[in-house]
Regions:
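Hinge/cleft segment of the Venus flytrap/periplasmic-binding protein
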Residues: 37-45, 56-57, 147-193
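Second-shell loop/turn segments in exported
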Residues: 1-8, 39-41, 66-69, 91-94
Length: 193
């Protein structure tokens, strides 16, 4: 029915977020308390990003998700849920948000609570949209895993291959990167989204 699927690997996005966190806290001997803003309940990105993240962080028993709730991929809900997390937990070390918008909303809540995002609470997000990249460049987001919407070049390569009678993989994973604060600063001027 179809020749190939081109898109993101959401599990791998979660793994990349987890690997970065694992590296940052490799010497941790005390609990590292993580709160998680999940995407829309039941959506593939929310399920898969959570699974990939958890798969990796379980390597360090000090990394603990102490609260996890949907933020519906929106800035407003991310802010609202983060406010609840901050009221319920006084010892949050890390926020993992399944997208930049929820992370940006959470930053508003963190700042309103008198805390410094990116310093008092380490922030990891997924997407790498312009606003998220700017927040990373400003030091408010520590690490972003890209979810690249620019599929055109990979799509055209696959179409040309099919037209030429060549075999193409059933699944082609989008080319995506990761960004620390410094890398976001460098990449921001050339971002297309």
């Amino acid at each position: 029915l179809y020749v190939s699927f081109i898109g993101s690997d959401f599990v791998e996005e979660g793994r990349r977020a987890g690997r970065w966190l694992l590296e940052q806290f490799k010497d941790a001997t005390e609990p590292v308390n993580i709160v998680e803003l999940q995407g829309t309940t039941g959506s593939a990105p929310a399920i898969d990003r959570k699974a990939g993240f958890e798969e990796v962080i379980k390597e360090n028993p000090n990394l603990k998700i102490i609260a996890s709730q949907t933020g519906d991929f929106t800035r407003a809900k991310g802010k609202e849920v983060m406010q609840s997390f901050l009221q319920a937990h006084k010892d949050i070390d890390v926020l993992y948000a399944h997208n930049d918008d929820m992370g940006l909303g959470a930053i508003q809540a963190i700042e309103a609570a008198g805390l410094v995002p990116g310093k008092d609470i380490i922030i990891i997000t997924v997407d790498a949209v312009r606003d998220g990249m700017q927040a990373a460049a400003d030091g408010k987001i520590n690490f972003i895993v890209e979810c690249n919407p620019l599929l055109g070049p990979q799509l055209m390569d696959a179409v040309k291959a099919v037209v030429e009678g060549k075999e193409v993989p059933k699944r082609i994973v989008t080319e995506e990167g990761t960004f620390t604060s410094e890398e976001a600063k460098a990449a921001l001027p050339d971002r297309k989204y």
